[in-house]
């Protein structure tokens, strides 16, 4: 049997990388030959966690079929968010907390999706169900993923299960949850030295919506003005992305992690859908979205509804 590659989505966030590391470890403990890999380099936030817990970043891969015919997916299922040759390999398992879309397999598989705030919360439960001890380093990456995905429990996606798992994992990792959590989130807000193109690609996903393609990117900051001062540069980069990739709409969500509010910037032919989705009026391609922090729960469903 060939080695099984375990990976999260393109433009990986802390959960995509942390869940790959923890799920690969769990599967190895259960007797499978696995390797955690990534579909991109770690963000500064993720690298902070990797460095803190002294874990080497997973190997970056762009395709799988040349080295294996077996993969396991974490933190995603939609093919357009996955590895380039996903249709050429056998998907053995999926562990995810997102909607199911653009996904099919030729063979039966293990599929576990739960409406929680973070994939690592589900994997924590799987460790317990299988009576596998979680090493401190692995626990550190898992709690980092939960902190990241739930914005330290401020996101509407956060559930009591996420909170309970985070506290248990923090104890194993021997960290102060609040103090470490704030440091982790702030590590991901250093945006000033990044080009517009890099900013737009830090955490971006494409979504097919009734024959249209919508790209939704999100960046976290502690200073909205710092990002919005670069609006013209960002708009030019968004327009270029639309032209290069045939996106019908590019949406950038700029989230203030301290206030739990976001500013939306939208460019594209389907821009009018924004006003209907969020009951706002775009002014200079922008709208303020109070209380919006979650792409998964507060942006994508609303856009999907108006496109349908």
Swiss-Prot record:
SMART domains: DHHA2
GO function terms (MF aspect): inorganic diphosphate phosphatase activity; manganese ion binding
Superkingdom assignment: Bacteria
Binding site for Mn(2+) 1: 9, 13, 75
Catalytic activity: diphosphate + H2O = 2 phosphate + H(+)
Keyword Electron transport: no
InterPro entries documented for this protein: DDH_dom, DHH_sf, DHHA2, DHHA2_dom_sf, Mn-dep_inorganic_PyrPase, Oligoribo/pAp-PDE_c-di-AMP_PDE
Cofactor(s) for this UniProt protein: Mn(2+)
Annotated EC: 3.6.1.1
Keyword terms, alphabetized: Cytoplasm, Hydrolase, Manganese, Metal-binding
Main localization, broad class: cytoplasm
Protein residues bound to Mn(2+) 2: 15, 75, 97, 149
Locations listed in the record: Cytoplasm
EC class: hydrolase
Gene Ontology CC terms, in alphabetical order: cytoplasm
NCBIfam families associated with the record: PRK05427.1
Entries under HAMAP family matching the protein: PPase_C (MF_00207)
Protein family membership: Belongs to the PPase class C family.
Name of the molecule in the record: Probable manganese-dependent inorganic pyrophosphatase
Upper classification of the organism: Bacteria, Bacillati, Bacillota, Bacilli, Lactobacillales
């Amino acid at each position: 049997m060939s080695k099984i590659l375990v990976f999260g989505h393109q433009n990986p966030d802390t959960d995509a990388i942390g869940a790959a590391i923890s799920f690969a470890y769990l599967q190895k403990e259960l007797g499978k030959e696995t390797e955690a890999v990534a579909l991109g380099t770690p963000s500064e936030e993720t690298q902070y966690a990797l460095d803190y817990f002294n874990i080497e970043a997973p190997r970056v891969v762009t395709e799988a079929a040349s080295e294996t015919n077996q993969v396991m997916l974490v933190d995603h299922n939609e093919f357009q968010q996955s590895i380039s040759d996903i249709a050429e390999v056998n998907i053995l398992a999926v562990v995810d907390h997102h909607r199911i879309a653009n996904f099919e397999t030729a063979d039966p598989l293990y599929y576990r999706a739960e409406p929680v705030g973070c994939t690592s919360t589900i994997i924590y439960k799987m460790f317990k169900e299988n009576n596998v001890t979680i090493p401190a380093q692995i626990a550190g990456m898992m709690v980092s993923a939960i902190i990241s995905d739930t914005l330290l429990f401020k996101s509407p996606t956060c559930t009591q299960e996420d909170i309970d798992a985070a506290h248990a994992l923090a104890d194993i990792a021997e960290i102060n949850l609040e103090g470490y959590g704030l440091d982790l989130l702030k590590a991901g807000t250093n945006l000033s030295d990044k080009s517009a193109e890099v900013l737009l690609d830090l955490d971006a996903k494409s979504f097919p919506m009734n024959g249209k393609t919508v790209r939704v990117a999100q960046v976290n900051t502690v200073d909205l003005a710092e990002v919005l001062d670069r609006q013209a540069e960002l708009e030019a980069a968004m327009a270029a992305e639309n032209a290069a990739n045939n996106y019908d709409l590019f949406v950038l969500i700029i989230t203030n992690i301290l206030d739990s509010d976001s500013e939306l910037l939208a460019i594209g032919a389907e821009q009018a859908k924004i006003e209907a989705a969020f009951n706002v009026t775009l002014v200079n391609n922008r709208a303020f979205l109070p209380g919006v922090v979650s792409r998964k729960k507060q942006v994508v469903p609303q856009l999907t509804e108006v496109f349908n």
